[in-house]
Swiss-Prot record:
Residues 12-106 form the HTH hxlR-type domain. This is Putative regulatory protein MalR. Disulfide bonds: none annotated. Potential regulator of the malBH genes. InterPro entries: HTH_HxlR, WH-like_DNA-bd_sf, WH_DNA-bd_sf. Keywords: DNA-binding, Transcription, Transcription regulation. It comes from the Bacteria. It holds the Pfam family HxlR. GO terms for molecular function: DNA binding.
């Protein structure tokens, strides 16, 4: 579903798209979830060299709030939380695949 209020804030559809996936970490998080499947917090933390716990938690929350990923919490001790990409998030994989290809070739 399109967030018209959010979309109307931008004059350019590229700006609108970047409002969902812009920044250093969001594309990388989406890439891992889109290409490798479900991850737990610790798995993502190990794959994202240099990210702080605070930044990872913030990025995951924003991606979940934007419905690009799902945060599934299991009622157990110790707590278990898994993250997976949504259909909306998968819609960005074509862009990320092109970025990945460009990065390999240049």
């Amino acid at each position: 579903m399109i967030d018209l209020e959010r979309k109307n804030k931008y004059k350019c559809s590229i700006e609108y798209t970047l409002s969902f996936m812009g920044g250093k970490w969001k594309p990388i998080i989406l890439w891992h979830l889109g290409t490798e499947g479900i991850h737990r917090y610790g798995e993502l933390k190990r794959k994202l060299d240099g990210i702080t716990h605070k930044m990872l938690a913030q990025q995951l929350k924003e991606l979940a709030d934007d419905n690009l990923i799902i945060r599934k919490e299991y009622p157990q001790v110790p707590p278990k939380v898994e993250y997976s990409i949504t259909e909306k998030g998968m819609g960005l994989m074509e862009i990320l695949n092109l970025m990945h290809k460009w990065g390999q070739e240049n």
